[in-house]
UniProtKB/Swiss-Prot annotation:
Protein name: DNA-directed RNA polymerase subunit omega
Cited Pfam families: RNA_pol_Rpb6
Encoding gene per record: rpoZ
UniProt keyword annotation of Transmembrane present: no
Keywords recorded for this protein, A-Z: DNA-directed RNA polymerase, Nucleotidyltransferase, Transcription, Transferase
Stored Gene3D superfamilies: 3.90.940.10
Amino acid sequence: MARVTVEDCIDKVDNRFDLVLLAAHRARMISSGSQLTIDRDNDKNPVVSLREIAEETISPEDLREELVHSLQKFVEVDEPEPDTVPLIGSAGASVDADDTEVAPERMTEEELLKGLEGLAPPEEQPEEDE
């Protein structure tokens, strides 16, 4: 029975490996209580799922979509974009428009040397032998 059913299904699903995935997923759905679309006739769930695909009472595309959805661990939710926020540069330009241009202060060599003299020299640490 199953061999004939698989041969009937190849017309509906081109790839036999995809057919196995879809039929197995449908058989698991039937085991978990999903409604049958054909009579059982004392067949087991995998055979019933193949017969459903062969008789086109269930769409292979719908099965594929349900299979992908069941395997997803993360479902992406499209959230609306936040309202446009003004750029910092454009907001800052309006605030700084009245200010005069700020020039960096120049330090002479003598001022630099006087500043360095006031600093304490770094403490020497003894070298450790490994």
